[in-house]
């Protein structure tokens, strides 16, 4: 009997966090380009999407999307970047059709949903743009002087000075192959084998990182280590073919 009692208590404790989590779900979940609060949106008309979290089936009859430059403007419906107006439709994915988006800017948005006799307003969320146009890129490609037969991994390092405390900082980085980014000795990002492979004659992918916490007022150091990729294949060292 004591064993049954202990097991019962353990199950109650195990399920409490799950129940608590379910109760904290927002009434409406929002995403931009299938991401929640994404950095690095670089399309002119991103897809805004949502779904209702309800225990009972609800049929959406109409919606309204509101996009603003700031959270304050969003909450007061003032100086909106886009107001779709009330649209009678059950669509839950809509392309942004407001004023042209600016590069390197955070936008706040929310959705109002009408169901049968009820209006639901989502909590505010945001998306942040990166390089909207090719002209937004100011950087130049860098490389070392060795050919692809040189096996050691190239490393680049740059020391710079921040005159003021860092409010916000982003890093936009790409490589024709793979890279590992460091700032002040810390690895930036949790993923590997970035960026993804494409036909480099047509398109090159890049990654966006929020590096605010990695930087400091005063001296900072950024480093990049390059790995073999599609422009510098080393078959034996990468795939162990001999």
Language-model features: locations:
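Pro/Thr/Ser/Gly-rich low-complexity, intrinsically disordered linker/stalk tracts
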Residues: 23-56, 126-133
């Amino acid at each position: 009997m004591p064993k049954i009692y202990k097991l019962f208590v353990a199950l109650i404790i195990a399920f409490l966090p799950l129940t608590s989590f379910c109760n904290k779900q927002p009434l409406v979940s929002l995403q931009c380009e299938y991401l929640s609060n994404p950095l690095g949106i670089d399309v002119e008309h991103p897809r805004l999407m949502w779904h209702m979290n309800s225990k009972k089936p609800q049929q959406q009859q109409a919606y309204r999307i509101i996009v603003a430059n700031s959270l304050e403007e969003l909450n007061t419906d003032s100086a909106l970047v886009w107001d779709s107006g009330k649209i009678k439709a059950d669509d839950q994915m809509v392309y942004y059709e407001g004023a042209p988006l600016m590069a390197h800017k955070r936008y706040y948005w929310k959705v109002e949903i009408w169901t049968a006799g009820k209006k639901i307003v989502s909590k505010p969320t945001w998306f942040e743009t990166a390089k909207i146009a090719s002209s937004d890129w100011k950087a130049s490609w860098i490389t070392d002087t060795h050919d692809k037969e040189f096996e050691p991994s190239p490393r680049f390092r740059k020391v710079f000075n921040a005159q003021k405390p860092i409010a916000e900082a982003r890093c936009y980085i790409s490589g024709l192959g793979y890279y590992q980014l460091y700032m002040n000795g810390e690895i930036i990002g949790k993923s590997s084998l970035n960026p993804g492979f494409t036909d480099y004659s047509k398109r090159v992918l890049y990654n966006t990182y929020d590096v605010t916490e990695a930087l400091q007022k005063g001296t900072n150091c950024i480093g990049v280590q390059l790995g073999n990729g599609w422009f510098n294949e080393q078959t034996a060292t990468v795939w162990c073919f001999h």
